[in-house]
Amino acid sequence: MKAWILLLVLTRCSWGLISADNTFSDRTIGEFRELLINTKDGALFAGSEGAIFRLWAYNINDTGENVFSKKQLILSETEESECCSTASDEKLCRPSTRFLAFTNNKDSIYVCSSVGMRPEIRVLDSISLQDQQEPRTEIGICVVDPTFNSTAVVVDNGNPEDASSVYSGIRTGMGGENHLIYRPPLTKNGKQLHASIRTIYSDNKWLNEPQFVGSFDVGQHVLFFFREIAHDNSFGERIIHSRVARVCKKDIGGRNVLRQVWTSFVKARLNCSVSANFPFYFDHIQSVKRVDKHGETFFYATFSTSETAFTSSAICMFQLSSINHLLDTGLLMEETANGQFAVTADEIPAHRPGTCSSNSHSISDTDLHFAKTHLLVSDSISGGTPILPLRDHVYTQILVDQLNNQNVIFAFDSSQQKMWKISHWKEGNEWKWNLIETQTLKTSGFRINDVALLPGEFFFATSKAGVHQFSVARCQELPSCALCSMDPYCSWNAVNSKCALKTKTNEKSVGWISSSWAGRISPECSAVEKLQVKDVYLGDGFKIQGARGGTWQKDGRDLEESQRHVATSQGELVILNVDVEDAGTYECTRNGVILMRARVVVHENCARPTSVAEYRSCQREWCKKADAYKAALNIWSDSNKKNVQCKANGPSINGL
């Protein structure tokens, strides 16, 4: 129950609306989909319906020949006609990218596209986008239907015979009824070295209608993240769990048992939940990003609840060391007619399921029979304390920027075009987070399809309208030192009282303030930030500058909204029809941190005029002041003319 209460009392998010710095579009092609970025070269690759583009990440609208390339995806009229005659939806016949990845040390781009409902593989030069080999049709790499959740990763090293290959989590069959983790036949110099290998799609203990969200090449393994049906409850409802599965790169299947089937496949549940007597689980993994930092590998993943009236989302982080430890040592589940139970440690054979072997053909049939039926680890992998649990939104995508003392998370709700920027850092043995800002992205009202990040500079989003480029920070819009120093990309100019983008030059310069602590306001702000003083009169209306996502307090107590006290979407506080009781100190806080402070002084004895006589009296006073101003202006004008005349009659420049 406590978990539900926590979700219900979450701080309300106020949304700013930001336009893209640049938007790239091409009227000759359809919807933009996949993004792939080379941060070293500043090259952004965008896949779409009809073409693949190479853009310059610092300005995606620059189409100069040195930074821009385009590869057209072509479908002949005959092929299109044949496809449309059998397709359930003609849109599926259009040539469209489904998967982009680097290969050959990023000198090449591996592309899988759906062309006339055929999965077509291309390998392109990463600069010119010219074909480096003949396009070919290959099933099992990417899906025809873009609504199917699939994943793939190119693995150039560590495979048998060091042959480059692709690992995919995919659906195959006419209706996509076969769910499998697959590696195509390994070839080298045109010769097949090993046959393809996969999971058993006819046995749902391996994969039960999985929805794949990500896959990663990690050491001697490949990891797959997905959600799947765990079981049906007593009401006949399908219970979904999020999983991570692992296979060994060297796996070539068994000799007799598990022939051309993974011998190393093992999986475990991912636990992203709010701790309580009855934990509240976020069971639907939506997206995942890898972060390698300080010798450790982390996976940041977004999760949601089931699609109910109380849909909620959160972000959890998993450590590779924790994943491997559980998969290597955890008790394994066995399924019987009476249900599932964990086998004891002494029942696990010497060759434990999930263990990598230099030659999987040498594993005994007995061990493989055990591995075939013991695929799931009984315990779950903890994702720690959920980051920014929030109601009424689904975090569909995530990006992570690695800074020295923190990671900056960008979470997105694709259908509502929302973005959250969050600071995440470790303090001692505890991980902490802080919400920096929330924004609505202007993508012409279209759903966000994919996102990518140029660290410290821009993030990118694709939609039906094009590719949109956004700065990671809008420092110039932050009105206070507190807000400015909290943003890791910004620095406060104490002399001009303005916020600007942090640079190596101003980061340590005198007069510039930026927080050296992750997610915290710089203590120097208290010395330079002035308390706003508002002099108001009875009956007035005015506003106090605040911060998005903040809550207001007056004299240390929470201020409730009313007809006279209104908080705007920008976080400002508007007070109407001022009363004596409105005098006091107002503070805008977020996560317990004071962002803005103002003192309101109400002048009781100088009320606005309420009668005609009082208005006429005020008018006479203003007329007197206006006459005095005009007289002073005339005196200044006469003096200025005399000064000009003196200069004109004085010595010339040549005479000086």
UniProtKB/Swiss-Prot annotation:
Residues 21-472 form the Sema domain. SMART domains: Sema. Regulates the formation or stabilization of cell-cell contacts at several stages of epithelial morphogenesis. In early embryonic development, required for proper ventral closure of the epidermis. During male tail morphogenesis, regulates precursor cell sorting and allows the formation of distinct sensory rays. Seems to control cell-cell contact formation through 2 parallel pathways, one involving efn-4 and one involving plx-2 and unc-129. Involved in axon guidance. This is Semaphorin-2A. GO terms for molecular function: chemorepellent activity; semaphorin receptor binding. PANTHER family: SEMAPHORIN, SEMAPHORIN-2A. It is found in: Secreted. GO terms for cellular component: extracellular region; plasma membrane. The gene is mab-20. Its main location: secreted. Keywords: Developmental protein, Disulfide bond, Glycoprotein, Immunoglobulin domain, Secreted, Signal. It comes from the Eukaryota. Pfam families: I-set, Sema. Glycans are attached at residues 61, 149, 271. Belongs to the semaphorin family. GO terms for biological process: axon guidance; negative chemotaxis; positive regulation of cell migration; semaphorin-plexin signaling pathway. Disulfide bonds join 83-93, 248-356, 272-316, 475-490, 484-499. Residues 1-20 form the signal peptide. Residues 518-604 form the Ig-like domain. Interacts with plx-2. Residues 474-523 form the PSI domain.
